[in-house]
Design a protein with these regions (language model features):
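PLP-dependent amino-acid enzyme catalytic core
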Residues: 1-124
Length: 124
């Protein structure tokens, strides 16, 4: 447990992510007979928790690795997280997305500074 806590404390995510609230879910709590709280990661700049992992990974790369850029495969939120993390850190981010990706998703990646490559129909 101590190792896990140490990893959390060392994670560098708050340069780009925000601390999101835990909101009570009274109806769900009543239905389940327990206090239920919802972590509001939809309030992040890319509307997802995936920004945290993407930024933390880029922050742990060496200068040489960052200068080479990063590439990922995503049809949405992870790609947006990588794009924003790359933009924030000055790292080239190439996001490979299926050709079937909705335009709104690929445009969101581009708007965050990611280079979109549309390739293939699926991930299979």
């Amino acid at each position: 447990m101590a190792e896990y806590l140490e990893r959390i404390l060392k994670a560098r995510v708050y340069d780009v992510a925000i601390e999101t609230p835990l909101d009570p879910a009274p109806r769900l709590s009543a239905r389940l007979g327990n206090r239920i709280l919802l972590k509001r990661e939809d309030l992040q700049p890319v509307f997802s928790f995936k920004l945290r992992g993407a930024y933390n990974k880029l922050a742990q790369l060496t200068a040489a690795e960052r200068s080479a850029g990063v590439i990922c495969s995503s049809a949405g939120n992870h790609g947006q997280g990588v794009a924003l993390a790359g933009k924030t850190m000055g790292v080239r981010a190439v996001i490979v997305m299926p050709t079937t990706t909705p335009t709104i998703k690929s445009e969101a990646v581009r708007a965050l500074g990611g280079e979109v490559v549309l390739h293939g129909m699926t991930y299979d």
